[in-house]
Amino acid sequence: MNKFLLVAMLVAPLAVIGADEAKGKKKGEKGFISLFDGKSLDGWKVNKENPKSIVVKDGNIVIDGPRAHLFYDGEVENHNFKNFVLRAEVMTKPSANSGIYFHTKHQDSGRPDAGFEAQVNNTHGDPKKTGGLYAVKDVNPAPAKDNEWFKYEIRVKGKKINIKINGKLTSSWTEVPNAPHLKSMPGRKLGSGTFALQAHDPKSVIHYRNIRVKPLK
């Protein structure tokens, strides 16, 4: 057999497998738009509290320092999201605490009053762990580990919020009028708004990357 023909016969199936794998990787990402370029904080705005707590390093948003919040302020949906799927990859260092806010708005200081927080906390002392809807539908134990990248997904459609960690549903909640446990948090209402990443305290180090969103109708 011609050696070139033999090589072609061996390589062709591998090429097909590679193409199928590539299609598989893209399949779940259709309609998603990147919110972070991996190089800068373009499209994002750090509030005035402690802006040095949030930087870009080695392709990641690195949170390390006193309390601050990084708000998405870019062009996608004019940074005003109602129904969406948000995905990000997150890595926590030991005893770190953070959060991903949604349906929120820029605030110069303090923790955002508007919107909800999806908790990021694997081993911090707070019993409210990663994958929970903070103080609304909490999770314990944590479904992820420190020093390992994990996949975070937040889906909001109508009055329903679903949170997944590494593809597994960890929290599901449907908003109802006058929920008793929300009376002390009047800003915890579904409506629309932007996203924010939290620097919780000086001892918390968290990395975020591959942040993207799929607006839903």
For the regions a protein language model found, what residue spans apply to each?
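N-terminal export/membrane-targeting signals
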Residues: 1-20
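Carbohydrate-interacting regions of secretory-pathway proteins
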Residues: 18-217
